[in-house]
């Protein structure tokens, strides 16, 4: 199977998942603890990039999305999501209360306000998702040539 991880990175992650310390892994792999640390750090960075890439792909293929600006009251977001869904002819399978509960749990919210810009979207499997504003620059540039 193709992955972004090297064979050594996979070995380190497997052994760490089993609870081994970096020094123990270094002994098993006949390398230094510092090298194990670097392998683990780079593997985790690759995993984070892969997750972000998948989230971006899901956002690109989303049925409906709403950009939320820092400082915006989360109680305005469900109505905006429903309006965008109506424009797209999509039924949102969540109530206002469920959307607000999702935002409180998953979005960067403090005291009802967005702490930073983010996007809430309904993915192709009708799941609510939160993403950073990763594709706005592309959308803003469309038609401006």
Swiss-Prot record:
InterPro entries referenced in this protein's UniProt entry, alphabetically: RNA_pol_sigma70_r4, Tfx_C, Tfx_DNA-bd_arc, Tfx_DNA-bd_euryarc, Tfx_DNA-bd_sf_arc
Database matches in SUPFAM superfamilies: DNA-binding protein Tfx (SSF89915)
Keyword Nucleotide-binding appears in the UniProt entry: no
Biological process annotations from GO: DNA-templated transcription initiation
A GO molecular-function descriptor: DNA binding
Keywords associated with the record: DNA-binding, Transcription, Transcription regulation
One Pfam family cited in the UniProt record for this chain: TFX_C
Source superkingdom: Archaea
TM segment ranges: none
Family the entry assigns: Belongs to the Tfx family.
Role played: Putative transcriptional regulator.
Protein name: Putative transcriptional regulatory protein PYRAB13000
Organism of derivation: Pyrococcus abyssi (strain GE5 / Orsay)
Classification lineage: Archaea, Methanobacteriati, Methanobacteriota, Thermococci, Thermococcales
């Amino acid at each position: 199977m193709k992955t972004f991880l090297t064979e050594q990175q996979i070995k380190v992650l497997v052994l760490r998942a089993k609870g081994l310390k970096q020094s123990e892994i270094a002994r098993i792999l006949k390398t230094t603890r510092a090298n194990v640390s670097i392998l683990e750090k780079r593997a985790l960075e690759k995993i984070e990039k892969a997750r972000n890439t998948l989230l971006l792909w899901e956002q690109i293929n989303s049925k409906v999305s709403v950009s939320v600006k820092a400082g915006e009251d989360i109680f305005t977001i469900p109505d905006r999501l429903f309006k965008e869904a109506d424009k797209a002819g999509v039924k949102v399978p969540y109530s206002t209360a469920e959307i607000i509960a999702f935002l409180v749990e998953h979005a960067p919210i403090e005291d009802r306000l967005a702490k930073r810009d983010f996007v809430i979207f309904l993915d192709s499997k009708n799941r609510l998702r939160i993403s950073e504003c990763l594709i706005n620059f592309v959308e803003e540039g469309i038609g401006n040539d």
